């Protein structure tokens, strides 16, 4: 089966670091692009999961916790957005997946990248890791995957 046409091509998405009229969508995009997080993982991030001093984020998925290293640029971006219990919340409750996808879609459209999605941004994360000579096992661990099976197509 043929993968998407974007597979294998590393995109220049440096414009994502520029200011945006959709700051939440921008931060969602950066968390996926920089750390390979899933929208569901992003929506469950509590402010207490972020350790700004150590630039790490604790992510929980299916009862498994993992620690994600944050870049100093991303840590700075996160520090500007924290206020309540969750990173993205309304009245103390996390926003819905639909909200996250609308924010991401609006941001990607603003940056002229309407053809991208959460999945294609996660793929960009994987491609960047491979470019940096990281092993599939390390990438799988960082993504919270139990095995490298879903990453085999990148060999």
Model regions and ranges:
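Basic, Lys/Arg- and aromatic-enriched nucleic-acid-binding interface segment
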Residues: 2, 6-39
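Alpha-helix N-cap/helix-start motif at helix boundaries, enriched for small hydrophobics
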Residues: 28-29, 40-45, 139
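Short, basic interhelical loop/turn and adjoining N-cap
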Residues: 49, 94-98, 145-153
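Short functional hotspots where side chains directly engage DNA or cofactors
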Residues: 55-59, 128, 137-155
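Active-site/catalytic core of tyrosine-dependent DNA strand-transfer enzymes
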Residues: 71-114
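Short, basic (Lys/Arg/His-rich) helix/loop patches that form interaction surfaces
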Residues: 102-141, 145
